[in-house]
From Swiss-Prot:
Required for maturation of ribosomal RNAs and formation of the large ribosomal subunit. HAMAP family: Pescadillo. One of its GO terms (biological process) is maturation of 5.8S rRNA from tricistronic rRNA transcript (SSU-rRNA, 5.8S rRNA, LSU-rRNA). Residues 584-627 form a coiled coil. Residues 524-535, 552-561, 598-617 have a biased composition (Basic and acidic residues). GO terms for cellular component: nucleolus; nucleoplasm; PeBoW complex; preribosome, large subunit precursor. Residues 542-551 have a biased composition (Basic residues). SMART domains: BRCT (SM00292). It comes from Drosophila erecta. Residues 439-470, 488-568, 598-629 are annotated as: Disordered. This is Pescadillo homolog.
Length: 629
């Protein structure tokens, strides 16, 4: 039996370097990158790099040998090779000025078909929905780009069309669940076929070209090329699941014979689709009751006692109420407010919305409509206001969706300081720091207790300040009253107008006898009380003081014992977990400290304001009393 040589088996044969992969596939580096992005092949990190690199200590980019063998049988490889042949022949025709042959070659340009790759990477539709987060975020970003060097205009327009179609599905299915405004953009989360899909829509800022090439738009464009095919398949399946016509179409009632529609019907329809304000054409009418919930309530009632089933019922009821949150409400969006995110929210939950017709096509009613219930404004004041509607800031819509109820509008009026906008994507049962505003939202009873504790502390501080401020005034008044009383006593010779030297000695003897008798009675009563106390005595308990040093020492000893019991192969993992725990505790402590300093500064400001007001009132009262005298 032949003895195997070194690096002929094991980890050395499981990995292959990028240079060897390029030689095996006979592709350039750019084509290899493109192929790996489209097929979902990525570099791997071996457990023992030196063994995987056959004894070499140089750091190389390694791939699984099985993945490269998998790429050898891909039909796209032949298309990428055809690109080289096409480039050589077209350059030759251009050099010899054979434009007739060049035109024929350009018509036969080899195109890459990615349909089979989408089916390979996502065997089921649920698998595609699970990987939809990055797809939507990237396509929403590219839909805002203008025509750049490496991003053609057709690609940006395609991204815009596909994302608008997906938003139409979200509105029609009423599957939106959570929203949040951040610096990065607008976060949306929808529940589609039981899968939670989260994506980011960037803010609408004018594009600023970058001088430095910090972002590789070419690589991102390859990702977009694959994601557009994937989202097209997904939209087709989702639209047909709701019996909606795909591509999106309008019913005949929307396409009225106006001058604008008769001039260019295609642009008229595309503008109305982008407005997100019209119902789409259905291939078959479906009752609303069938669309409400996908949960079989009869199946849940069979096992109604379990906590999980009760929780699912409550969630289903909340979702059914959320779908009709804005039903019966009419909104009007001012020109300074971002239109698209608010239209998505309002229409997803059953509301009606419109805007100024000069901003964008698709408005259904004007600002002067008397049936408008809410007008969304983002400016400090408005010249003309209607009594029949509420003027609110945009945050009210987002907070209502996250709280799943219509909140009072008084905190969101024009010019009001808005309440904190909390993220709904944070777990409420986490161990980290939770701000008091979030606690109050989770448990409304905490609002009253928190406010009551603040009022009690402020009242105590006010009482102390009042005592210190009025102490000097009280002392002066008491001293003045004492002086007046002593003067009257000396003037009239005692309380009854009789001089003390002229009193009878017999009266003094009688008074002394009465005092002695009273003292004897008091002594007897005190003796009886002491005897009764001795019979029914209760021993006072002793206060047990906890020694904090001993408790801390016991915790440290227990932690050390726990660390000793960890197996050697798990020590690095144990240290990592302890480090993460310490960093989390430190962050929580810093946030609590920051909160305490902010609250202390606010409380001190309120105290100083009240103190100054009290001093001014006291000074005014003193001045008034002087004038009265």
């Amino acid at each position: 039996m032949r003895r195997p040589k070194k690096y002929e088996s094991g980890e050395a044969t499981q990995y292959i370097s990028r240079r060897a992969a390029l030689r095996k596939l006979q592709l350039s580096l750019n084509d290899f990158r493109r192929l790996c992005i489209l097929k979902g092949v990525y570099p791997r990190e071996p457990k023992h790099r030196r063994r995987a690199q056959k004894g070499s200590s140089e750091i190389k980019v390694l791939y699984h040998t099985k993945d490269i063998r998998f790429l050898l049988h891909e039909s796209i490889v032949w298309t990428l090779r055809d690109y080289k042949i096409f480039a050589k022949k077209s350059n030759r025709d251009r050099a010899i000025k054979d434009f007739r042959n060049l035109k024929r070659r350009l018509a036969l340009f080899p195109e890459i078909k990615l349909d089979h790759i989408v089916k390979e990477r996502y065997p089921t539709f649920i698998d595609a929905l699970k990987d939809l987060d990055d797809c939507l975020t990237l396509l929403f970003l590219f839909s805002t780009f203008p025509s750049l060097h490496l991003i053609p205009r057709e690609q940006s327009n395609l991204c815009r069309r596909l994302t608008i179609e997906f938003l139409h599905y979200v509105i029609a299915s009423k599957s939106l669940r959570k929203v949040f405004i951040s610096i990065k953009g607008y976060y949306f989360q929808a529940e589609i076929k039981g899968q939670k899909v989260t994506w980011i829509v960037p803010h609408y800022y004018p594009f600023k070209p970058q001088s430095r090439q910090e972002v590789d738009f070419k690589v991102m464009s390859i990702f977009v090329e694959f994601y557009t095919i994937m989202l097209g398949f997904t939209n087709f399946r989702l639209f047909h699941g709701l019996n909606l016509a795909y591509p999106p179409q309008f019913p005949s009632s929307v396409l009225q014979d106006s001058e604008e529609s008769l001039k260019d019907e295609a642009s008229f329809v595309s503008d109305r689709i982008a407005a997100l304000n019209f119902e789409l054409l259905r291939t078959d009418k479906v009752q609303e009751d069938e669309e409400e919930l996908d949960i079989d309530m009869e199946l849940l009632e069979q096992d109604g006692d379990s906590k999980r089933i009760i929780k699912m019922k409550q969630e289903a009821q909340e979702v059914s109420r959320l779908r009709t949150l804005f039903k019966g409400l009419k909104f009007f969006i001012n020109r300074e407010v971002p239109r698209e995110p608010l239209v998505i929210l309002i229409r997803s939950f059953g509301g009606k919305v419109s805007w100024d017709s000069s901003i964008f096509a698709g408005s259904t009613y004007d600002e002067g409509d008397e049936t408008i219930t809410h007008q969304i404004v983002d400016r400090p004041s408005i010249t003309t206001q209607y009594i029949s509607r509420d003027y609110i800031q945009p945050q009210w819509v987002f907070d209502c969706v996250n709280q799943r109820q219509l909140l009072p509008t008084n905190k969101y009026f024009i010019g009001e300081t808005l309440p904190p906008h909390l993220s709904p994507f944070v777990d409420s049962k986490r161990d980290s720091y939770i701000p008091p505003e979030e606690k109050a939202l989770l448990d409304p009873s905490l609002i009253e207790t928190h406010a009551q504790s603040d009022e009690d502390s402020e009242d105590e501080a006010e009482k102390e300040e009042e005592e210190t401020v009025d102490q000097e005034l009280l002392d002066a008044q008491l001293q003045l009253a004492y002086q007046q009383e002593t003067a009257e006593y000396k003037k009239y010779g005692g309380p009854d107008g009789v001089n003390e030297d002229e009193e009878d000695p017999e009266d003094d003897d009688e008074d002394d006898d009465e005092e002695e008798a009273e003292e004897e009675e008091l002594d007897e009563k005190s003796k009886r009380l002491q005897e009764e106390k001795q019979k029914m005595s209760v021993q006072s308990g002793k206060v047990h003081k906890v020694n904090k040093r001993q408790v801390h020492k016991a915790e440290v000893d227990e932690h050390r014992l726990q660390a000793r019991m960890v197996k050697p192969r798990h020590r690095n993992l144990f240290r990592k977990l302890i480090r993460e725990k310490q960093t989390k505790e430190k962050e929580e402590w810093l946030l609590r400290k920051k909160r305490r300093t902010i609250e202390a500064s606010e409380k001190e400001a309120r105290k100083t304001a009240k103190r100054e007001a009290r001093k001014e009132a006291a000074a005014a009262a003193a001045k008034a009393s002087k004038l009265g005298k």
